[in-house]
C-alpha cells in the first residue's frame, strides 16, 4: 500500500507519518510512505497512492484535493485543515474523511479504518 502525506510543515508531516506507521505496524499493514512538503512537489509526482493525507490547508489544499480526485477516482483522500469550512466541500469530492486540526492519533486511526473499508 502506498501512502502520501502532504504537509507544508516538516515536523507536522513527520508526526503524521509516525502515527500512520504505528497504525500500519499495529495492524500488520505493509505500507510505503512518501511526504510532500509543497503543492508543486505533489503536483509533479508520477506515482499513484492508495491513501493521501492532504494537509496543505486552505484553498491550496482543497485545490490539490480537487486535482487529485479528477485524475484518481479510487484514491482514499483524507483532507486535514484547521477550519470546518472545507468539511462540506470534502464531501462533494468524495473524500474518505476530514480531520480538523489539531490532529491526534485517534483521528489517524479513524481515517485509516475508513480508508481501509473498516477491515482493521
Question: Predicted segment positions?
Answer:
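The C-terminal output helix
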Residues: 113-120
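A short, hydrophobic beta-strand element within the central beta-sheet of small alpha/beta folds
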Residues: 53-54, 74-85
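Short amphipathic alpha-helix used as the core "switch/output" element in two-component signaling
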Residues: 62-74
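Two-component/phosphorelay signaling modules centered on CheY-like receiver
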Residues: 9-34
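Acidic, metal-coordinating helix/loop segments flanking the phosphotransfer/catalytic sites
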Residues: 35-51
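C-terminal output helix
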Residues: 103-112
